[in-house]
From Swiss-Prot:
The keyword NAD applies. GO terms for molecular function: 1-pyrroline-5-carboxylate dehydrogenase activity. NCBIfam families: D1pyr5carbox2, PRK03137.1. The gene is rocA. It catalyses: L-glutamate 5-semialdehyde + NAD(+) + H2O = L-glutamate + NADH + 2 H(+). It comes from the Bacteria. This is 1-pyrroline-5-carboxylate dehydrogenase. Its EC number is 1.2.1.88.
Length: 515
């Protein structure tokens, strides 16, 4: 009997023992920085001359690791292995597959601070953000294992007296998992384990800036007893390996988390039926957002300011759920803006390996350059009241930036920035605020700070986002509690960590027997 699902608690670093344990995790990771990691195809570890070099975004001179890079030839080998392995893996018992997830979760739980320390070094996450990432990875495995046990016998359907009808789920086939750099453990592990526990085999292509944590996760899966060939580790260039696998006629589905433009490109390529292909590929995509916190005039204004700052600048704003727009009723606009500026100026931007750092670096030079270009746009479209500066001399650090008095149709209110920049916009009334919030091609997360019950219910109906929060920030969805995924250009309407997510990795089969 499996105990009921409960999310992994976050670590309290005010407890000295927890602080010391995390520091030990950092020391352990530092002891193997710079190591080489192989591809893994059918259990075979393959080393290539061409490497993906992972560096610490807080210290560009520090090498986190070097991961062998797959070529198209190796990607083809991995596809053949995954396709062949699927013929046996699809017949494996769901209970066995779920047990592998539970064992993997237990292994990660024992090594929790080590994995979080990898995220500090490779993704530039402060302690609390890294800890939450690792906890979410554990949650995905615990939750999806239990969900598979619920779905293993199918869903009851009606039968007449002369027949026996069954509605069951069977796996799809080979899945290509293209995971992001911003949650390089949680989302990567969630996408991968959802696919494998559903009976599919996997080609895992992690983000090129954060491949080491994925390589370490492959060790966990092996230790947990996952058979060789079920998950094949093929880091590589998106334009070479990614496109090749998306186009491949034996690819049955693609699970992607990343930018809007790449997601659209994958969706377009997957729609084409290539020679030898006998199915329409399924795409499961989460593609970002332009997320808004709406502040009503009847609201806890201190809560509003704190929610905006936490949601805008957590992990340097590099969350698809991050608050990129604060739309505030004109009667309370100045108060909330001024308080948010005060709170923002209290944030520390520094080495994320140091406990107490609020913000670390952004992901890489490309991210730094993009965010700073939007800071420049902000100087033209509004008033910069906090931040506005960056320093890429040692790492890619950007100060948390508030841009005030931004027009509702400005670029800062329309385009995804993916960095520590939030635009403040004034609304005439609550209806106007909702209209501004909905005036975007995205629809991922949003929040409303209000004490007006009628306004809360109106937003519940009319605020068109997949994850809507009231009287809290717009980030921090918990697996199994707040299934995550959005509308419009935020993706394909999938809900990671939700009760229908595994079904996206399977197909329904009806059998009817005459008695």
């Amino acid at each position: 009997m499996v105990v009921a699902y409960k999310h992994e608690p976050f670590t309290d670093f005010s407890v000295e023992a927890n602080k010391l344990a995390f520091e030990e995790g950092l020391k352990k990771v530092e002891s193997y920085l710079g190591q080489d990691y192989p591809l893994i195809i059918g259990g075979e570890k393959i080393t290539t001359e061409d490497k993906i070099v992972s560096v610490n975004p807080a210290n560009k001179e520090e090498l986190v690791g070097r991961v062998s890079k797959a070529s198209r030839e190796l990607a083809e080998k991995a596809m053949q292995v995954a396709d062949e392995t699927f013929q046996t893996w699809r017949k494996s018992k769901p209970e066995m597959r779920a047990d592998i997830l539970f064992r993997a979760a237990a292994i990660v739980r024992r090594r929790k601070h080590e994995f979080s320390a990898i995220l500090v070094k490779e993704a530039g996450k402060p302690w609390n953000e890294a800890d939450a990432d690792t906890a979410e990875a554990i949650d995905f495995m615990e939750y999806y294992g239990r969900q598979m046990l619920k779905l293993k016998d199918g869903i009851p359907v009606e039968s007449r007296p002369i027949e026996y009808n069954r509605f069951s789920y069977i796996p799809l086939g080979v899945g290509v998992i293209i995971s992001p750099w911003n949650f390089p453990f949680a989302i990567m592990a969630g996408m991968t384990t959802a696919a494998l526990v559903s009976g599919n085999t996997v080609l895992l292509k992690p983000a090129s800036t954060t491949p080491v944590v994925a390589a370490k996760f492959m060790e966990v899966l092996e230790e947990a007893g996952l058979p060789a060939g079920v998950v094949n580790f093929v880091p590589g260039n998106g334009s070479e390996v990614g496109d090749y696998l998306v186009d491949h006629p034996r690819t049955r589905f693609i699970s992607f988390t990343g930018s809007r433009d790449v997601g659209i490109r994958i969706y377009e390529r997957a729609a084409k039926v290539n020679p030898g292909q006998i199915w329409l590929k399924r795409v499961i995509a989460e593609m970002g957002g332009k997320d808004t916190i709406v502040v009503d005039k009847e609201a806890d204004l201190e809560l509003a300011a704190k929610s905006i700052v936490a949601s805008a600048f957590g992990f340097s704003g590099q969350k698809c759920s991050a608050c990129s727009r604060a739309v505030i009723h004109e009667d309370v606009y100045d108060h909330v803006l001024n308080r948010a500026v005060e709170l923002t100026k209290e944030l520390t931007v520094a080495n994320p390996a140091v406990l107490g750092t609020n913000m670390g670096p952004v992901n890489d030079q490309a991210a730094f350059d993009k965010v700073m270009s939007y800071v420049a746009i902000g100087k033209e479209e509004g008033r910069i009241l906090a931040g506005g500066e960056g320093d890429d001399s040692k790492g890619w650090f950007i100060q948390p930036t508030i841009v005030a008095d931004v027009a509702e149709d400005a670029r800062l209110m329309k385009e995804e920035i993916f960095g520590p920049v939030v635009a403040f916009c004034k609304a005439k009334d609550f209806d106007h605020a909702l209209a501004i919030a909905n005036n975007t091609e995205y629809g991922l997360t949003g929040a409303v700070i209000s004490n007006n019950r009628d306004h809360i219910e109106k937003a519940r109906e009319d605020f068109h986002v997949g994850n809507l929060y009231f009287n809290r920030g717009c980030t921090g969805a918990i697996v199994g509690y707040q299934p995550f995924g959005g509308f419009n250009m935020s993706g394909t309407d999938s809900k990671a960590g939700g009760p229908d997510y595994l079904a996206l990795h399977m197909q329904a089969k009806t059998t009817s027997e005459t008695l």
